[in-house]
Amino acid sequence: MSSQYERELRHVLAGIPDGVEKVIRSCTVDEKERMRMVLKRPFLVVRAAGSGIEGSGDLLALRGDICFPIEVKTTRARKLYLSGRTLDQYNALVYEGERCGLMPLYAHRLKGVRGDSWRIFRVETTTLSGSLGVLARRIPSLPRTRNGRAFIDWEQGMPLNEFIQIVCQQDPSSPTLGFL
């Protein structure tokens, strides 16, 4: 994982105007509008210490209403099969998600694509409640091979602009995701 792309995602989720504008240059007008929603409801995004080890993910996105550990992957290939170290990272994310009631995410950036090149996937956990439980139903989980092993398929992920639209919607009656 290149820190350049990790930084790119960090700047978008943190609502840094220059970072958002850089990422949306080749997006459609609708995608740009959705991505800019993060400017009004940004996250505090920190790089996780020991990134990728013990289920921490690469980034931790925090806001008063939600929190996500995010594992960032960047490839030229549309599919990434998890094995070895990447499978260990996945298993650790599942464990920590279950243990702490979190919804870990994978963010996959496909190199060489115009428009929204990021896709978001959810790591399946069973301990989600409240607004995270509702949100989980809207975000696709990692697909499975015929043997049942999780893998990343860029085509099956949620575009980042749609993810931002969901988590950054403003409901005047509630500062949380209760409106989902």
Question: What do these predicted ranges mean?
Answer:
Residues 1-50:
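Acidic-basic catalytic patches of nuclease active cores, encompassing PD-(D/E)XK
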Residues 41-44, 72-79:
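Short, basic, glycine/proline-bearing loop/turn elements
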Residues 75-99:
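Mg2+/Mn2+-dependent nuclease catalytic core
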Residues 94-128:
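Nucleic-acid nuclease catalytic cores
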